[in-house]
Amino acid sequence: MKKKYFGTDGIRGKVGASLITPEFTLKLGWAAGRVLAKSGSKKVLIGKDPRISGYMLEAALEAGLAAAGLRPVLMGPMPTPAVAYLTQTFRATAGIVISASHNPYYDNGIKFFSDQGTKLSEEIELEIEAEIDKELKCVDSSELGKAYRIEDAAGRYIEFCKSTFPSKYNLNGLKVVVDCANGATYHIAPLVISELGADVIAMGVEPDGLNINLNCGATSMQAISERVVKENADFGIAFDGDGDRVMMVDHTGYVLDGDELLYIIARDKLRSGTLKGGAVGTKMSNLGLEQSLKTLGIPFERSDVGDRHVMELMIKNNWCIGAENSGHIICSDHLSTGDGIVSGLQVISAMQSSRMKLYELRQGIKKYPQILLNLGFDNKIDPLQDNDVLAEAKRIETLLGDKGRVLLRKSGTEPVFRIMVEADESEKVVRGYAKSIADKVKV
């Protein structure tokens, strides 16, 4: 059955329009409460990123959950993976995150975690949708839920993050630039890195509700790249607005994406004998990653785009690492969802164990030039059904043979058509291939 409200990563949209309104959010909280109340604890944890609309949506969710008889547990600004982790440690029935991740402040979203810290199954999402369409009826007054706040949630999560970094290593003597995107990691990531011994230069740690992801963080790496070089830092680490993505910068200012970080983690696990099976990427992962891993003898498989699909393939194969090139990296031996801080620490651990700089570790992977074009399109004409678009893509695929790839897909969260072309050619040539397909799209 097709979902009516939930997208690929919860419910997301522009605040005040679509579904991101106080009215709908209250109804969503009630509907989710009705479904979740059927099992286990009545506690539901709520975390959010610092964008201004989060306060409004948090209040609406709190009211809806309480009306269904559940106890909302408020944690304030908290990274998405922290909510996943704390949902398990508090034995809550679910966790809810109010965030639009890497999107601008005027968007927001709501996503859920199960009591095991995993994304809700599509079956549960469909159950919640069925309840949304019913009339809201409060439980009896004696059964109403009562909200309370956890004051030490950040401290608990900081200790968890540090526990994933081998105790035999420290960051003494290292200068590290940390960019928190004015998002949910602003009060956590700098402390994690500094408590491990590094001299931290913090950026993006002054959220005002409107500046989340604004020219900073994992989706805008120019500022941290320049800062690392200016400060003569050893490396930089950047997160997105909700803290589930990570990108890194070596001492030269070069930006390492999720593909390169996955390679470094996989290689380190292979060397230490802790690699279980292989590594999972997505259809967007660079062909160079696949070939570099195979050179090491590490199996590699691709899932559909989205961390949910990455995790599903990891579970199917019984593998412990997977990533998207956007910086969602899952290390399931630590947590069952993408965690920017924890994943970054695994890369830093690889630096420590190999006694190599980030610059040296990235030399093992040769990436092909990859061009990604994002196009708005006319909703009346599906580009994936447009014969002109498909014919041009097929022509280029035939031309490239096994030396490159073409991938066409629509975004699951916004009306955007994505064209990806990569090949063992110059960037100029690859861009030309992508543009020739884009020229066929009716916008």
From Swiss-Prot:
Binds 1 Mg(2+) ion per subunit. It is an enzyme of class 5 (isomerase). Catalyzes the conversion of glucosamine-6-phosphate to glucosamine-1-phosphate. This is Phosphoglucosamine mutase. NCBIfam families: glmM, PRK10887.1. It comes from Psychromonas ingrahamii (strain DSM 17664 / CCUG 51855 / 37). The keyword DNA damage does not apply. Its EC number is 5.4.2.10. HAMAP family: GlmM_B. GO terms for molecular function: magnesium ion binding; phosphoglucosamine mutase activity; phosphomannomutase activity. The modification Phosphoserine is found at S101. GO terms for biological process: carbohydrate metabolic process; peptidoglycan biosynthetic process; UDP-N-acetylglucosamine biosynthetic process. Mg(2+) binds at S101, D240, D242, D244.
